[in-house]
UniProtKB/Swiss-Prot annotation:
Domain of life, per lineage: Eukaryota
Designated name of the protein: Putative uncharacterized protein encoded by LINC00612
Classification of source organism: Eukaryota, Metazoa, Chordata, Craniata, Vertebrata
Composition bias type Low complexity, residue spans: 73-94, 159-182
Organism per entry: Homo sapiens
Region span, Disordered: 11-182
Length: 182
């Protein structure tokens, strides 16, 4: 046994320059007991696993190569995350975002125009002749208003954010959009 200049541990075995590529991890000394279980990422190897990227050598570490859930399980996960996020921050989980004083009914109906059960469209009470307005939710559980993205100019954004307490509207009014900077 000799002392290695790289890792300065004594006593341990260190491969010499002839033994191939070295790792910065030195071998575990036998005097201290069994080697600890280290989870190290394995390099890409040719074969079917190379398409998935580097995989962990330790079975307890997830590789994160599974595809995201689809269908009903994805909807239940989204619903659970929205329910968990509501109520912790004032205004973050509220669904009381009223539309701006001016009408956005044409823009708020959405680009796809799908109206019906499960589409997310909400008809204004007592006004059957008007097109239904659509509400969408941002990732934090707050209802986002269509008005912020449809307004033009900083003054319109400020007037919109003054009536709306949702997190998405206040965040959008605080920073200028790319169209305004151009």
């Amino acid at each position: 046994m000799r002392r290695c200049r790289r890792c300065a541990r004594w006593p341990h075995r260190c491969p010499g320059p002839q033994s191939g590529p070295r790792s910065h991890f030195s071998p575990w000394p036998r005097t201290l007991g069994p080697a600890p279980a280290l989870c190290v990422r394995t390099p890409l190897r040719p074969g079917p696993s190379s398409a998935l990227g580097p995989l962990s050598a330790c079975p307890s570490v997830p590789d994160y190569t599974a595809s995201p859930p689809a269908g009903d399980s994805a909807r239940s996960i989204v619903a659970a995350s929205r329910a968990a996020g509501s109520g912790s921050t004032p205004g973050a989980g509220s669904k009381d975002c009223s539309p701006p004083p001016h009408s956005h009914s044409a823009a708020a109906a959405g680009e796809s125009g799908d109206i019906g059960p499960g589409s997310g469209a909400v008809e204004a009470p007592g006004r059957g002749a008007r097109r239904p307005t659509r509400q969408r939710e941002d990732g934090g559980g707050a209802v986002g208003c269509f008005g912020v993205s449809r307004h033009r100019g900083r003054e319109a954004q400020m007037s919109h954010s003054s009536h709306c307490g949702s997190r998405s509207c206040s965040a959008a009014a605080a920073r200028p959009s790319l169209l305004q900077l151009a």
